């Protein structure tokens, strides 16, 4: 979430770096909002890399958590970010970064970075870490929503083609997917799967939300003339914005208010985590939320998050394993809290569901605030009426 002074030189290279169709696909969702008069805009939507290792008899008893923080500083440094703060419990090491978050568990790494970080450049360091603890690579997923300002990205993130080529170089049997319409809000997902099935348990879940057009009465709280780390001051920010309703006192948290703007928070509770990242500038306001919290229905949690940011539009993506509480509810035909009936103030724009063997489900849904839809319809209707009633 580091908001600093960036060169705008890359803003004029759009036409020179968009020749292959996959690059254009990555751009279509956001070019409609491009305003060259606006100047610098921060890339809020994050890249996400998750790597899971298989523990064997030779694997260190503490797995990846046995490694010193200097290892993770090297991983983070390879993608042009730094560790700002750290918290831990019995199961998770949590790191707030200058560009989002890192979570390290015994058998898993979750690395989430925003801006123009080069996340895929961290793969060699991560594979070295797995080798150091004598683990075996079991699962890799790389995911990002379509970038808001893709012409600002650096290699290998300048196109989906380059990202795919880099991933295939490291994980030749991995497969790419696109969730959602390529000319609107969509996700690129790459998965490498070497899980030995049937395995003892597949009960993971992941809920992610990306939100745009945040309420100005809320975003005003995430501007500052200095950096502020976890303290009474950041607690006051959480209280004023009602973030403390999402991350209550049962969680161990650490957060950071950036200068001149931006905010990040990580929270851990036993084996669960939550993370949020906020870009508050009005012309590119954005917030993201992610958790692996176990629930059979996500509506309460999602409503609390939406209550904080009050976005004009949002996308929710859910990954669920068949043995998770939400996975069992889904497979029994029950609502899991992401369906339209839970959010009457929003209209569903698009829904995509992919089912992977054995019962692993990925679901993505795009919503837009009802008032925004009505305003668009009214404006179009007025324009048509004006055209019909023009001078003879």
UniProtKB/Swiss-Prot annotation:
- Extract the GO molecular function terms from the UniProt entry: adenosylmethionine decarboxylase activity
Family (UniProt): Belongs to the eukaryotic AdoMetDC family.
According to the record, cofactor stoichiometry and binding are noted as:
Binds 1 pyruvoyl group covalently per subunit.
Catalytic residues at 43, 46, 100, 114, 264, 277
Q: Does the keyword Metal-binding apply?
A: no
Question: What Pfam family is a match, any one?
Answer: SAM_decarbox
Its GO CC terms are: cytosol
- Its Enzyme Commission number(s) read 4.1.1.50
Q: What's any GO biological process attached to this entry?
A: spermidine biosynthetic process
Task: Describe PTMs of this protein.
Answer: Is synthesized initially as an inactive proenzyme. Formation of the active enzyme involves a self-maturation process in which the active site pyruvoyl group is generated from an internal serine residue via an autocatalytic post-translational modification. Two non-identical subunits are generated from the proenzyme in this reaction, and the pyruvate is formed at the N-terminus of the alpha chain, which is derived from the carboxyl end of the proenzyme.
- Write the protein's name: S-adenosylmethionine decarboxylase proenzyme
| Residues that bear Pyruvic acid (Ser) | 100
What is catalyzed by this enzyme? S-adenosyl-L-methionine + H(+) = S-adenosyl 3-(methylsulfanyl)propylamine + CO2
Q: Which InterPro entries match?
A: AdoMetDC-like, S-AdoMet_decarboxylase_euk, S-AdoMet_deCO2ase_core, S-AdoMet_deCO2ase_CS
| Residues carrying the site annotation Cleavage (non-hydrolytic) | 99-100
Look up the coiled coil feature and give its residue ranges: none
**Which keywords label this protein?**
Autocatalytic cleavage, Decarboxylase, Lyase, Polyamine biosynthesis, Pyruvate, S-adenosyl-L-methionine, Schiff base, Spermidine biosynthesis, Zymogen
Tell me the enzyme class: lyase
This protein's cofactor list reads: pyruvate
Q: Which pathway is this protein engaged in?
A: Amine and polyamine biosynthesis; S-adenosylmethioninamine biosynthesis; S-adenosylmethioninamine from S-adenosyl-L-methionine: step 1/1
